[in-house]
Each structure stands twice: as C-alpha cells, then as structure tokens.
Amino acid sequence: MTNIRKTHPLLKIINHSFIDLPAPSNISSWWNFGSLLGICLMIQILTGLFLAMHYTSDTMTAFSSVTHICRDVNYGWLIRYMHANGASMFFICLFLHVGRGMYYGSYTFMETWNIGVILLFAVMSTAFMGYVLPWGQMSFWGATVITNLLSAIPYIGTTLVEWIWGGFSVDKATLTRFFAFHFILPFIITALVIVHLLFLHETGSNNPTGLNSDADKIPFHPYYTIKDILGVLMMVSFLMTLVLSFPDLLGDPDNYMPANPLNIPPHIKPEWYFLFAYAILRSIPNKLGGVLALILSILILALLPFLHTSKQRSLMFRPITQTLYWILVANLLVLTWIGGQPVEHPFIIIGQLASISYFSIILILMPISGIIEDKMLKWNL
C-alpha cells in the first residue's frame, strides 16, 4: 500500500517540502536560520493575536491597554515580552540568514533572493509599525521622524506625509491605520515565505562549497529535522532567558512614558535592529540624500547577483573577499553603535566613514577582489 503522505493532495506538498526533500549532505548549521525564522514568525503571529485581543488602537487608551495587558491579563506580561523580544530574535535570525546568503553566494538563486529582499522590507516595515503601537514617547517621536522622511520626496512629499498621517500630525488616525497594517502584514509575509520556499525548492539548496551537490543528496527528514529541532531549542532557550530575566534589555526606557507631543526626548532612536540604517541616514547632511542612502542600504542586497565577478560561488576558497566580508560585518556593528549615539563629534565623522566603507566594500572592493582571485587561480607558482 502506498504511503498516504505521498498520495494525499495536501500531505504530498508537505512531504515534498519537509520530509522527502532532497538536501545536500554537507549543509552546516548556517542553514538552520530559515526554519528558525519560520518559528519566529509563528511565535510573533500567535503572541500578536493574543495581544490584539486586549489592545485598543486609540491615542487615549493605547498606552493604558498595554499596561493593562502586563498587569491584569493572565500571563499578559509574558505574551507582551515574548512579542517584543521575539521581534529582536526575528531580526537576529534574519541578519544571520542574509549574512549566510552573502557568504556562500546563495544570491545566485535570483528569484529566491529577490523575494527574500522583499521579505526583509516587509518585516522591517511591520516591526516599525509595531513599535508605534504602545504609544510611548519613543513610539510617537519615532513615528513622527521616520514618516517625516517621506517629505523629502520632491513635489508630492508633504501631501504624501499628511496622507499617511491621516491629518496634520501623528495622531489617532495614524495609530489606527498602523495597527491595521501591523496586523495584516505578517499574513502577507507568510504568503511571501511560501513563495520564497517554492522558488528555493525549484533549484534545491546551496551548500558551503558552492559546488553542485546533485550527486550527494540525503532526505530532509530525519537528518535535518533533528538538526533544526536542536536550533529551535537553542533559540527558544535564548529567547526565554531574555524574556524572563532581561525583558527590557533591548527596549528604550523612554517608551515607558506616555506619548507627549509637547515634549521631545533628548535622543530619538529606533529599535537596535534599525540602528545601522539610521546611522547611514544621519551620516548624510542632505535630507533627500539621507533617505536615498537609507533605502539603498537595504536595496543594495538586490544588486549582489550583478556584482558577483568570481568564477567561484562561495567565499569558502576566496581569502581576500573573505577578509572584506568580515570587515563589512565589523563595519555594520560600528554603524549599529553609531546609530545609538548622539549627533556630535566624534560620532558624526565615524558614522560618515562607516557609511562610505559599507557602500565601498559591497559596490567596489568585493567585485574587484573577485576578479583578482580569479587571476590568482591562473598563476603557476
């Protein structure tokens, strides 16, 4: 008798995606982050659903409703902090997932990569809108500053900002629509994730060597299901340590003060996972230039397939580009640090140098090093 998982129309899809999927035998733990992101998305949707049951998207009651969730709802504090810190875990996994793709040349799967870039934008916009919902000081001023950036668009900018606000400032209409979008976007993200996987399964997974692995494939289950479960346990342990012992470690104390349009916080800054982009935005004195640099800092990922000059796919056997890659990682950490610092000397110049380095490494140095490494392979020493 044929196994039902191979014949049933629905189970067949699951079987081909997670059970009998042929996977390279040599993929390392860097390939765990896809499944971890799936778990993060599930955690966020579930905790978010329960939060939405008690939250009110009105400027008068939003802050109080979050306080009510933490104080009066059964395990409300746990749900709220799992959602807030779950977002941080989501971005940690996202950055590592993208970093893995850059290191091992996974961006040569064009469709999968481009859907991934769209997903990154969708997750970032969802997180930004979610940060506005508690209606604390940093929520209000963060929303004001970031939405105001659209006013840099020539001719239609001011009208566009007022249209997004639903008035002449960030107010009740803004909060209501941000809640609506914050609720719907994770489901759009889920649909995009399915498309992302669909394109990935058309080509099969990449592997650390970047070489064709068709001759050496193993079934996804049980080998990689067990491996993924280990990753999930480690991530959930880390998340719960964060939630139960250091729930406010990654948050901003200013957000425990209700939003006050008459009182500007001394340092307006976004959540830690946006700081690198925020530093790039601030490093350019011109408003429109800053906005373009901000968008390009993420959109540059879509250019990676066109900037690949080497005959080798992965960085595994490319020492010069490897060095540049790790300099880029260090550079991103510097940008993250600068994004959280006040706009004063010496932070301004450090931010500007780090921003120039970021674009130079990706657009100029890495493609050149790829060409040099190819030439080095032809040397007969």
Curated annotation (Swiss-Prot):
It is a multi-pass membrane protein. Its cofactor is heme b. Heme b b566 binds at H97, H196. Heme 1 (or BL or b562) is low-potential and absorbs at about 562 nm, and heme 2 (or BH or b566) is high-potential and absorbs at about 566 nm. A ubiquinone binds at H201. Heme b b562 binds at H83, H182. GO terms for biological process: mitochondrial electron transport, ubiquinol to cytochrome c. This is Cytochrome b. The chain crosses the membrane at residues 33-53, 77-98, 113-133, 178-198, 226-246, 288-308, 320-340, 347-367. Keywords: Electron transport, Heme, Iron, Membrane, Metal-binding, Mitochondrion, Mitochondrion inner membrane, Respiratory chain, Transmembrane, Transmembrane helix, Transport, Ubiquinone. It is found in: Mitochondrion inner membrane. Belongs to the cytochrome b family. Component of the ubiquinol-cytochrome c reductase complex (complex III or cytochrome b-c1 complex) that is part of the mitochondrial respiratory chain. The b-c1 complex mediates electron transfer from ubiquinol to cytochrome c. Contributes to the generation of a proton gradient across the mitochondrial membrane that is then used for ATP synthesis. InterPro entries: Cyt_b/b6_C, Cyt_b/b6_C_sf, Cyt_b/b6_N, Cytb/b6-like_sf, Cytochrome_b, Cytochrome_b_C_euk/bac, Cytochrome_b_N_euk/bac, Di-haem_cyt_TM. Binds 2 heme b groups non-covalently. GO terms for cellular component: mitochondrial inner membrane; respiratory chain complex III. CDD domains: cytochrome_b_C, Cytochrome_b_N. Gene3D superfamilies: Cytochrome Bc1 Complex, Chain C. GO terms for molecular function: metal ion binding; ubiquinol-cytochrome-c reductase activity. The cytochrome bc1 complex contains 11 subunits: 3 respiratory subunits (MT-CYB, CYC1 and UQCRFS1), 2 core proteins (UQCRC1 and UQCRC2) and 6 low-molecular weight proteins (UQCRH/QCR6, UQCRB/QCR7, UQCRQ/QCR8, UQCR10/QCR9, UQCR11/QCR10 and a cleavage product of UQCRFS1). This cytochrome bc1 complex then forms a dimer. The keyword Nucleotide-binding does not apply. The gene is MT-CYB.
